[in-house]
A protein has these predicted regions:
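Metal-dependent de-N-acetylase/amidase catalytic core
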Residues: 1-10, 100, 104-287
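Active-site rim/loop-helix segments in enzyme catalytic domains that contact anionic ligands
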Residues: 1-121, 154, 233, 262, ...
């Protein structure tokens, strides 16, 4: 095992950095791993609960600062939310690409931009969205995953005398996370063919995940909603993984072992009832 990991996380929206693999990110940050978080857009075209709530009020009761907010002002607000999320999780570097929300299409310019980040950061682990479409998928999510995978192929196939840069082969594993509800349908746990092969127990840092989601005021995820999101999603994953709260991942390539894998967590495991570290976790008792 590497003593410390260098992890690159790439998501299309600020909210994804809080609702998807944030517990896993917090765990790795606590163990001293370097975390670079890339947010492709400011998320200005979806989950606009803050603006919708204001617009639903009678004109005389509306806050002009919100009701008349410009696109640039709204983007800046979303940017600050992402910055606070990164601070909560212990992210070392936050990178904004400034792409237009709802307009993430697979093209060579975007691939080149992500490839440049990979060359600079030199990660050994990459976390991004599952790059698979189905009829229910919001396309920014899988499109981002596809762009990241092509960028990884691009940096691995550079030749200095042809391209002016060296190839980078340092990424040891990619982990795909699952966007809420998109890979899950109403008739089964997961869409057929999509099955996680890695579960991370995030029970020890669930308060940090709640606190991160609590920053998403523009989306209405703050307050009690932050806890409800975690209970509904990560509590469900935990039920499947055999712990209080978990995050699921799927790897594009298998890991080969010299012998059957028996990590210390499994070898030393003795039965004990699940006990949360901080009692009833709500957004109101998180510092």
């Amino acid at each position: 095992n590497l003593e410390n990991h260098n992890i690159l996380v790439v998501y299309p929206h600020p909210a994804d950095s809080a609702t998807e693999a944030s517990g896993t990110v917090a765990l790795h940050a606590e163990r001293g791993d370097k975390i670079t978080s890339v947010v492709a857009t400011y998320g200005e075209r979806h989950h606009m609960q803050w603006l919708h709530d204001e617009e639903s009020k009678p004109a005389a009761e509306q806050d002009p600062a919100v009701a008349r907010m410009t696109l640039e002002e709204y983007r800046n607000f979303k940017k600050r939310e992402a910055e606070r999320i990164a601070e909560v999780l212990g992210v070392n570097e936050l990178v904004f690409l400034g792409w237009n929300d709802h307009e993430i299409y697979f093209n060579l310019d975007k691939v080149a931009e992500i490839a440049e980040v990979i060359r600079r950061v030199k990660p050994d682990i990459v976390i991004t969205h599952l790059p698979i479409h189905n009829g229910a998928v919001y396309n920014d999510h899988p499109n981002t995953g596809q762009i990241v995978m092509k960028a990884l192929e691009t940096v691995a196939n550079r030749v200095r005398q042809f391209d002016g840069v060296d190839a980078y082969h340092g990424v040891k594993q990619v982990f795909f996370s699952f966007a809420s509800g998109e890979e899950v349908n109403s008739n089964s746990v997961f869409t057929p063919g999509i099955v996680p092969d890695v579960w991370v127990d995030i029970s020890a840092v669930i308060d940090k995940k709640i606190h991160a989601i609590d920053q998403l005021v523009s989306q209405g995820y703050h307050g009690e909603t932050a806890r409800w999101v975690v209970e509904a999603r990560d509590g469900r994953w935990g039920m499947l993984a055999g712990c209080a709260y978990a995050e699921p991942f799927l790897r594009p390539t298998a890991i080969t072992y010299d012998t059957l894998p028996m990590p210390p967590r499994v070898v030393s495991k003795e039965y004990e009832p699940t006990v949360l570290h901080s009692g009833r976790t709500t957004a109101h008792n998180v510092p």
